[in-house]
Amino acid sequence: MSAGNGTPWGSAVGEEAWAGSGVAVEGSELPTFSTAAKVRVGVTIVLFVSSAGGNLAVLWSVTRPQPSQLRPSPVRTLFAHLAAADLLVTFVVMPLDATWNITVQWLAGDIACRTLMFLKLMAMYSAAFLPVVIGLDRQAAVLNPLGSRSGVRKLLGAAWGLSFLLALPQLFLFHTVHRAGPVPFTQCVTKGSFKARWQETTYNLFTFCCLFLLPLIAMAICYSRIVLSVSSPQTRKGSHAPAGEFALRRSFDNRPRVCLRALRLALLILLTFILCWTPYYLLGLWYWFSPTMLTEVPPSLSHILFLFGLLNAPLDPLLYGAFTFGCRRGHQELSIDSSKEGSGRMLQQEIHALRQQEVQKTVTSRSAGETKGISITSI
């Protein structure tokens, strides 16, 4: 078995580092750089290149100034932060995982062990919390389209703040453990940080809930409320509104095409999050409650599932690129429709003005004839 990470936050490395097939040392076996680990490293490098390029492009696209906007829209701000979270996963989690599988043991020292485990979990938290913020923003945009969007920055600050605070225990749980023998071995583990097995299981379950279960429930609630609101009969009724309200609503009805694309993008991000990480977290749950499964499940399966989870970071910029292309087409169609509508209005106004001129001429000629008749009669 390779040395790598038992879970996305690496808290099960202690057991994995000393178990499995490898080099026998004093009656036990140490991990080796197996063929499965080599494939994992190769795929991780491909994911790193694609994720770094895609998310850097998204970050540049959403942060560059727009001529038509004084400041970035809330949607662009949200996806800028999501790209930053994906880049944190790209530049911390992926290189750490690849390097650790190559070196097998930990060679960077105790301080780097604690710091990198902290940054790794913070990256995972931010990548899980920011889709929740996007879901809350989409919910507010649909349920209260005329409301203020000033709360987006507070939600973003809360997401990053929670990511930092919840990852802090990693600084105290992880440390380096040295093993003497014919083949000296050092590993970055949580071994000895928990007095009992149930304490480590509780910490893992808490991290699992914060990383996966709670964000999933929050996003499911947000999008369920959106679907119920959009499909409700009151939302479909627009003809019974007063004229002024109808005109205001019509001005917003041109925007929902873009809002709908943003909603679809957010839903796709939720689906990719579920599809990419659910299998691996289920495997982690199985391991926490049945540690003996580590010797029953082939190492290649854990490698595949973890790589499938890392696929989430490269997919986000592809989804955003499709969203941006759709928005540009939508804006072009909207501008064409607006120009056609404006031309039609101008034509109607000209016809109405000509008709008024004809009516005025007719009235003037009639009044002139009546005046002439009266003057002749009087003579």
From Swiss-Prot:
Cytoplasmic compartment segments: 61-76, 137-160, 225-278, 324-379
Keyword Iron-sulfur appears in the UniProt entry: no
Glycosylation sites (chain numbering): N101
SUPFAM superfamilies from the UniProt entry: Family A G protein-coupled receptor-like (SSF81321)
Disulfide bond annotation, renumbered to this chain: C113-C188
Keyword list, A-Z: Cell membrane, Disulfide bond, G-protein coupled receptor, Glycoprotein, Membrane, Phosphoprotein, Receptor, Transducer, Transmembrane, Transmembrane helix
GO cellular component, one term: plasma membrane
Pfam families cross-referenced by the UniProt entry: 7tm_1
Gene Ontology terms: biological process: cellular response to hormone stimulus
Subcellular location: Cell membrane
InterPro entries for this protein: GPCR_Rhodpsn (IPR000276), GPCR_Rhodpsn_7TM (IPR017452), GphnRH_fam_rcpt (IPR001658)
Residue ranges of the TM segments: 41-60, 77-96, 115-136, 161-178, 205-224, 279-297, 304-323
GO molecular function, one term: G protein-coupled receptor activity
Residues on Extracellular side: 1-40, 97-114, 179-204, 298-303
Keyword Disulfide bond attributed: yes
Function, as annotated: Receptor for gonadotropin releasing hormone II (GnRH II). This receptor mediates its action by association with G proteins that activate a phosphatidylinositol-calcium second messenger system.
Record protein name field: Gonadotropin-releasing hormone II receptor
Natural source organism: Chlorocebus aethiops (Green monkey)
